[in-house]
Amino acid sequence: MEIFDYDNILLLPRKCRVESRSECDTSVELGGRRFRLPVVPANMKTVVDEKICTWLAQNGYFYVMHRFDLDNVQFVKDMHAQGCFASISLGVKQPDYDTVDRFVAEGICPEYITIDIAHGHADSVKNMITYLKAKIPAAFVIAGNVGTPEAVIDLENWGADATKVGIGPGKVCITKLKTGFGTGGWQLSALKWCARVATKPIIADGGIRSHGDIAKSVRFGATMVMVGSLFAGHEESPGKTVEVDGELYKEYYGSASDFNKGEYKHVEGKRILEPIKGKLADTLTEMEQDIQSSISYSGGKKLMDIRKVNYVILGGDNAGEHLLM
């Protein structure tokens, strides 16, 4: 198995078939809905809040609300009241089961539920998927996070409708340093490896540092790409604004950091400051245009045409072997 990450790969262009990149369709389908981009902001406290999630849903983007200090049932009611789809995160502890019971008792069904724990290839996740499928069968269940084909096969067999792939490749994640495990440094290979066995959508989570990495993720099997640091640090971002030497920054920290947990126990995340980079809508527009360009370079008109291109692995003597021609 070849090992590579985003920096080691370049996609090879094919003959362009469009007059303008604006003809290229960046939309993607997930759980019976079509979204404008194959991109979803990370379900982290410094990336999304109720206001951002509402705006994303109203403007045709996918979102996943975080699960920290939040009344999930009220959140779903609020989203439905505004005519929006509801997409929430759950853990695997007793309060999460209680939340599911409240949904059932009140006859409420979130359209998307993401079971979101650091090591998602676990019996605890199997049990939660089984419970959700029995209690709220209409919900589209995303489960993760995982980093191996065995995990993807198991999660799909347990009933997950999509899997989230990525263990520790994120900018504020220190899992590989703290534990010695993960996909940090080879996330793109791990995605390719997992996608080979997947029969349902994969959400690639973590390691995205530029818009081109989104196209690379789609090429190697992602339906949707979860992005944290590129979405943190906007004017609307919920992170605290910090001034350093006259420059404005937003706080961005990992979900398993002591900043998020409020205690120093089982810490696998850190805090950084992201320079404030304008409005979220502008970044999403730029992302859309860049992905349209990627599609035009792929010789196609639709997002999944990116999957047909060849690629080279940089930095190895054997780069030529990987041309698929």
Swiss-Prot record:
Provide a GO biological process annotation: purine nucleotide metabolic process
Q: Name the active site residues.
A: C173 (thioimidate intermediate)
Question: Which Gene Ontology cellular-component terms appear in the entry?
Answer: cytosol; GMP reductase complex
Q: Which PROSITE patterns match?
A: IMP_DH_GMP_RED
Under what name is this protein listed? GMP reductase
Which positions are annotated as binding NADP(+)? 202-225
The record's InterPro entries line, in alphabetical order, gives: Aldolase_TIM, GMP_reductase, GuaC_type_2, IMP_DH/GMP_Rdtase_CS, IMP_DH_GMPRt
Quote the EC number.
1.7.1.7
Query: Which SMART domains does this entry report, sorted A to Z?
Result: IMPDH
